[in-house]
């Protein structure tokens, strides 16, 4: 999650929980399968347009980058995007326009959870 510096620990907890809930509910990700990083930026390093495609962005903008193993359908990804937005808005940490999400998919051989193994390439 990329965001402007200044969010409280409680706000970051709400952001993390909202995204995790969407992953669990939409993609059946296990509750304890959590890999989340926050990158906070000073104002001079967090630059974005004020609006695009009908959105009006504020300094509360969250730029969320997600990396998945390839294979999930477009429908599942669209459902996830909607769930993330809905959960963050319901948590009161951001307005609906300020949720910018990018999903990148990688092949199974491009991920190691440790020990120098591509664990997901060993199974299908």
Cite the ranges covered by each PLM segment.
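A domain-level signal for the structural core that forms small-molecule/cofactor-binding pockets
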Residues: 1-124
């Amino acid at each position: 999650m990329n965001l402007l510096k200044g969010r409280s620990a409680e706000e970051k907890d709400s952001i993390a929980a909202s995204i995790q809930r969407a992953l669990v509910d939409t993609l059946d990700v296990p509750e304890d399968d959590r890999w989340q990083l926050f990158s906070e930026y000073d104002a001079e390093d967090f630059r974005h347009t004020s609006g695009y495609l009908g959105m009006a962005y504020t300094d509360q903008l969250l730029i969320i980058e997600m990396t998945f193993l390839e294979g999930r359908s477009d429908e599942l990804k669209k459902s996830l995007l909607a769930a993330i937005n809905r959960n963050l808005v319901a948590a009161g940490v951001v307005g609906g326009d300020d949720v910018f999400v990018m999903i990148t998919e990688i092949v199974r051989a491009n991920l190691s959870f440790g020990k120098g193994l591509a664990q997901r390439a060993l199974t299908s």
